[in-house]
Amino acid sequence: TSDELTAFLEEELHLVHLRYMRGYKNVINECIRLNESGVVSPLAIETSGHGALSENYYLDDGAYLAVKLIIAAARARVRGRTVESLIDKLNEPAEAVEYRLAVKNTDNANAYGESVLDSLEERALEVRIQVASPSYEGVRLMFPEGWALLRMSLHDPNMPLNMESKEPG
């Protein structure tokens, strides 16, 4: 998840953003767990767009979310605004890329990937690169101008490397 989304949610909307692992069911289950532990958590939404609301029993229901957006658009229009204006202050990174690094020539892609992640984190700490904590999946390296996240794919024998920068180039 981009730093810009976190800033928008926390600074503009005064919400709490939990950057959790990928996988819509993982996100929904964590949201349910948080609510059951007393942490108010009304929305679970995954990077892919899957989302669930507590008011709808945490069902992954795109039609329900679409109706909620239509209602928000109607309310915005009554106030002379557009639905797009609701996210006017949401900034985008200057650049964002993803590379999928294939894991080959091994019988256990997950074990190999975990060893790569362990080595990356160890080396990053040795050279004093900030490692995000907590990190629920992979290793997220933090830089003044952006971040990089290396993780295991949920479904394929590869390691996605996502990078975002606040500066072009």
Q: What does each model-found stretch correspond to?
A:
Residues 1-169:
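Phosphate-binding and adjacent anionic-ligand microenvironments
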